[in-house]
Design a protein with these regions (language model features):
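A glycine- and small/hydrophobic-rich beta-loop-beta segment
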Residues: 281-286
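Nucleotide/pyrophosphate-binding catalytic subdomain
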Residues: 1-266, 273, 277-279
Length: 286
């Protein structure tokens, strides 16, 4: 069914106060491979790129932080390596960290940059290794070359944003000696949002949002607080791969990021629905 001119105008009018509110504000968006579940990769990526470009064109300052877990696992399988995870983090030996670098920096990052740049040369790919962006420390000897964020130097990101570009960040960090570490992209997104004093931190995933009862869609949490999320992690309601996302939301909001969101990246234009409509979508943490 076609949309009438009046309905189209109403959509634009509804977006106007949000365009004003978020003008010149940083929004960090974590784009993960799981956000592509249920849709063709090309279509999902093109729609995501359109959202990012529109956000930039109306005066927002988006930063994209990406994962690549499914792609890393796929290449590992082709090479005969078995992926192992503990609490949502990949166990990473020396060969695996090289595979992660190849996939994140050499495959996923250029794909995202190219998709955004279809609409104009505004995206620039960077790695956490560039300009000392992500300084890493080992997380746990049992995880191998899996790192935690020691500190973020946002200088290169601020320079790109000030020049009108959209940074697209691959989440490989290095320690003081230059050793590369694979860092969970959810964790990096939260740390970058804090370093840039972001207005919003957004996670795109393959679920509609957070639930109080895992198997009950009616228990979707529309709005929550860091304290409630702490309780849901403590009682096991939030577990597995969702833990890094939720921990990062909690830490970022407590550190001064105004809003954090968990959205279903399979929904077309979900970013625009969250940012520019009255109802919003998914789960908001504040």
């Amino acid at each position: 069914m076609s949309t009438s001119p009046g309905e189209k105008a109403a959509v634009l009018v509804e977006a106007l106060p949000y365009i004003r509110r978020y003008n010149d504000q940083v929004v960090v968006v974590k784009y993960g491979g799981n956000a592509l579940a249920g849709a063709s990769e090309d279509d999902a990526l093109a729609i995501f790129a359109e959202d990012i470009v529109l956000m930039r064109q109306v005066g927002m300052r988006p930063v994209v932080v990406h994962g690549g877990g499914p792609q890393i696992s796929s290449l590992m399988a082709r090479l005969g390596k078995v992926a192992e995870f503990r609490d949502g983090r990949r166990v990473t030996d020396a060969e695996t960290v090289d595979i992660a670098r190849m996939v994140l920096i050499g495959q996923v990052n250029p794909q995202l940059v190219a998709a955004i740049n279809v609409h104009g040369t505004i995206a620039v790919g960077v790695s956490g290794e560039d300009a000392g962006l992500i300084r890493a420390v080992p997380r746990d000897p049992d995880l191998g070359f899996v790192g935690d964020v020691d500190r973020i130097d946002p200088t290169i990101l601020r320079a790109l944003l000030d020049d009108g570009f959209v940074p697209v960040v691959a989440t490989i960090g290095t320690d003081e000696s230059g050793q590369a570490y694979n860092i969970n992209a959810d964790t990096v997104a939260g740390a970058i949002a804090e370093a840039l004093d972001a207005e919003k931190l957004v996670y795109l995933t393959d679920i509609e949002g957070l639930r109080r009862v895992v198997d009950d869609p009616a228990s979707l949490i529309r709005q929550t607080t860091p304290d409630e999320l702490d309780a849901l992690m403590a009682d096991g309601t939030i577990a597995g791969g969702m833990i890094p996302k939720v921990e990062s939301c909690v830490h970022a909001v407590r550190a001064g990021v105004r809003r954090a969101h968990v959205l279903d990246g399979r929904i077309p234009h979900v970013l625009l629905l969250e940012v520019f409509t009255d109802e919003g979508i998914g789960t908001m943490v504040l």
